[in-house]
From Swiss-Prot:
Component of the cytosolic Fe/S protein assembly machinery. Required for maturation of extramitochondrial Fe/S proteins. May play a role in the transfer of pre-assembled Fe/S clusters to target apoproteins. It comes from the Eukaryota. [4Fe-4S] cluster 2 binds at residues 168, 215, 394, 398. SUPFAM superfamilies: Fe-only hydrogenase. This is Cytosolic Fe-S cluster assembly factor NAR1. Keywords: 4Fe-4S, Iron, Iron-sulfur, Metal-binding. InterPro entries: Cytosolic_Fe-S_CAF, Fe_hydrogenase, Fe_hydrogenase_lsu_C. GO terms for biological process: iron-sulfur cluster assembly. GO terms for molecular function: 4 iron, 4 sulfur cluster binding; iron-sulfur cluster binding; metal ion binding. The gene is NAR1. It comes from Kluyveromyces lactis (strain ATCC 8585 / CBS 2359 / DSM 70799 / NBRC 1267 / NRRL Y-1140 / WM37). Belongs to the NARF family.
Length: 469
């Protein structure tokens, strides 16, 4: 949430309705005529604060007055209290998962290489909290990507307009609350956070799952009705560091050369897999992986990259000289770009025409005899005309999540840090998604969200709103 909205002197009179981007309108009250005049008396009705979509996206997920209720189960202090109770009763084990963006952020913060950070983190969770499992999220991400690709292959031929990725809870909440027309175009495949949690709960149904994620919106994702049993608590790297401070712990004192990843991995899992990555963006590579999955059946094709008007918009096209544009996908990050995308997609009458036009335009360009390299110089990215869009609420994507350790940086340094982390991300060894999924995904779980339209709440009861989640 922006600093403006956190100011203590701000009158937080935003009704805690579920559509806070559309603040409740004050009811007009007719005043009875009076012959008495009061001087210097201010209105008894507090002035409502208007939150723009830019404030809402990539923050803490539409949270105002109900913040304490919504996040009552999602903080490092709650984790410490809960784990203390569980440890005394000795009823449950601890399972910890951490995303690659968080690992890179912590490695940068503690001036460690990624391998040292991973060993240090594993040792800390095992020694301090007696963790049974400590894993990365690549296993869950691989399954998420595979399920998304399979869904796209089924739905793209029949869908009018692009299909939208739903792994970013900030975008999902925005669509469910304010843009219900987008929901039919959104994929319901769960994120790596939830799939990892589901798999850990299968390995040990009694485990308490702590997930460390790059943004605060992931807390709200874990609070969804269909997700509650998969993740017990979500904290960010900022909160992880704050927890160490509360415990007066020197994290670097847990550095070790011993790799405990094998013994901290559930039985039957590839213990190396969790700490790897995959080709594509530092937000998960969903857009790129879709085309990569199709390229295997089109051996003479190439994937070309088309830059957008800014660095947060990128389009990919799978092309060949014989077939033209075979498929397309795009990445759209940040409020302004999401707003532009939604504006185009909301024009439902022209969505189908745009879907046809993009392929015809692509084919005509390639059939003119130009090479793929030359073609990219004359094309402009247009996500609204692609088959699939990887949407992330944070500018620069998940590598710039609000929960990462970059709060003290100014705008330029923050952007540079995101670029540095993205570069470091590309150096993480990549895995082949089809190989992983073939070996480990038994297809017995659907791993799906229950996407739905969220109607604005008419209740002013904060507790009632919190219970809605």
């Amino acid at each position: 949430m922006s600093a403006l909205l956190r100011d203590a002197d701000l009158n937080d009179f935003i009704s805690p309705g579920l559509a806070c981007v559309k603040p409740a309108q004050p009811q007009k009250v007719e005043k009875k005529p009076s012959f008495e005049v009061e001087v210097g008396i201010e209105s008894s009705e507090p002035e409502k604060v208007s939150i723009s979509l830019q404030d809402c996206l990539a923050c803490a997920g539409c949270i105002t007055s109900s913040e304490e209720i919504l996040l009552s189960k999602q903080s490092h202090k709650v984790f410490l209290e809960k784990w203390s109770e569980l440890e005394e009763l000795d009823e449950r084990s601890l399972a910890v998962s951490i995303s690659p963006q968080c690992r890179l952020s912590l490695a940068d913060y503690y001036s460690m290489c990624l391998a040292d950070l991973d060993r240090c983190f594993q040792n800390f969770m095992k020694t301090k909290f007696n963790a049974k499992y400590v894993v990365g999220t690549q296993f869950g991400r691989s399954i998420s990507i595979s399920r998304i690709n399979a869904t796209l292959k089924d739905r793209v031929p029949e869908n009018e307009g692009p299909l939208l990725c739903s792994v970013c809870p900030g975008f999902v909440l925005y669509a469910e609350k304010t843009k219900p027309e987008l929901i039919p175009h959104m994929l319901d495949v769960k994120s790596p956070q939830q799939i990892t949690g589901n798999l850990l709960k299968q390995a040990d149904p009694t485990c308490y799952h702590l997930s460390i994620m790059p943004c605060f919106d992931k807390k709200l994702e874990a609070s969804r009705e269909e997700c509650e049993k998969e993740v017990d608590c979500v904290i960010t790297p900022k909160e992880f560091v704050a927890m160490l401070g509360d415990l007066s712990i020197d994290f670097k004192s847990y550095m070790t050369e011993y790799d405990s990843s094998k013994e901290l991995c559930p039985s039957g899992w590839d213990y190396k897999l969790h700490w790897l990555s995959n080709e594509g963006s530092s937000s998960g590579g969903y857009a790129y992986q879709y085309l990569l999955s199709l390229q295997s059946s089109n051996p003479e094709s190439d994937i070309i990259t088309i830059e957008g008007k800014n660095s947060d918009v990128t389009e990919y096209r799978l092309v060949s000289k014989s077939k033209g544009v075979i498929a397309s996908s795009s990445e759209v990050y940040g409020f302004r770009n999401i707003q532009n995308l939604v504006r185009k997609l909301s024009q439902s009458a022209s969505v189908k025409k745009r879907g046809i036009k993009v392929k015809r335009r692509g084919q005509s360009v390639l059939k003119s005899g130009e090479t793929s390299e030359k073609t990219t110089k004359v094309l402009t990215a247009d996500p609204a005309k692609t088959d699939f869009v990887e949407v992330m609420a944070c500018p620069s994507g998940c590598i710039n999540g609000g929960g990462l350790l970059n709060e003290e940086k100014n705008a330029n340094r923050r952007k540079q840090l995101a670029q540095d982390l993205s570069l470091a991300y590309t150096k993480v060894h990549s895995v082949n998604i089809p190989d992983i999924v073939h070996a480990y995904d038994d297809k017995s779980n659907d791993f799906k969200y229950n996407l739905r339209v969220i109607e604005p709440s008419t209740s002013s009861d904060v507790v009632a709103v919190g219970n809605t989640w």
